[in-house]
Amino acid sequence: MNRNTMDIYKILKQLPHRYPFLLVDRVLAIDKGKSIRAVKNVTINEPFFQGHFPYRPVMPGVLMLEALAQAAALLAFDAIDTTPDEDSVYYFAGMDGVRFKRPVEPGDQLILEVELVRMKAGIFKFKARALVDNELAVEAELTCAVRKIA
């Protein structure tokens, strides 16, 4: 496999999330310390579609942001050459400028694009957006932090 991509097995080694909360299916490209482009394939089998909404399934906006935060985590871990362990945790610490532009529905492929803006002392700032068919679905500035817990 290309060093600049990740399949689901590599993602599972880098993220603690598991079904139904793992929201990154593949990394298409990663430019160390700069940016990542990843995919979330949205299917009708997603558990959140049972109640959001039964008559017209739409991916909750907070889960689009979570998918972006998970892609950001992959970028952060790659930037600092680390694999998370049981003694550390990666927090989604904040978001600014969030704008939802279009609904995401079953069958859509959510392309996650995250750019690392700044990192200092375990705090990471990102500019993030997600697209469907080259159309902006959501954009935000994300703040995340890596902390030792042991």
Curated annotation (Swiss-Prot):
Domain of life: Bacteria
Catalytic residues in the record: 52
Compartments (UniProt record): Cytoplasm
GO cellular component terms, semicolon-separated: cytoplasm; membrane
Keyword Lyase belongs to the record: yes
Keyword Cell cycle included in the entry's annotation: no
Chemical reaction(s) catalysed: a (3R)-hydroxyacyl-[ACP] = a (2E)-enoyl-[ACP] + H2O
Keyword annotations of the record: Cytoplasm, Lipid A biosynthesis, Lipid biosynthesis, Lipid metabolism, Lyase
A molecular function (GO) term: (3R)-hydroxyacyl-[acyl-carrier-protein] dehydratase activity
UniProt-listed InterPro entries: FabA_FabZ, FabZ, HotDog_dom_sf
Disulfide bridge partners, by residue number: none
Record-level GO BP terms: fatty acid biosynthetic process; lipid A biosynthetic process
Top-tier EC class: lyase
Major localisation: cytoplasm
Enzyme Commission identifier(s): 4.2.1.59
General function of this protein: Involved in unsaturated fatty acids biosynthesis. Catalyzes the dehydration of short chain beta-hydroxyacyl-ACPs and long chain saturated and unsaturated beta-hydroxyacyl-ACPs.
NCBIfam families associated with the record: fabZ, PRK00006.1
Family per similarity comment: Belongs to the thioester dehydratase family. FabZ subfamily.
Protein name: 3-hydroxyacyl-[acyl-carrier-protein] dehydratase FabZ
Organism: Albidiferax ferrireducens (strain ATCC BAA-621 / DSM 15236 / T118)
Gene: fabZ
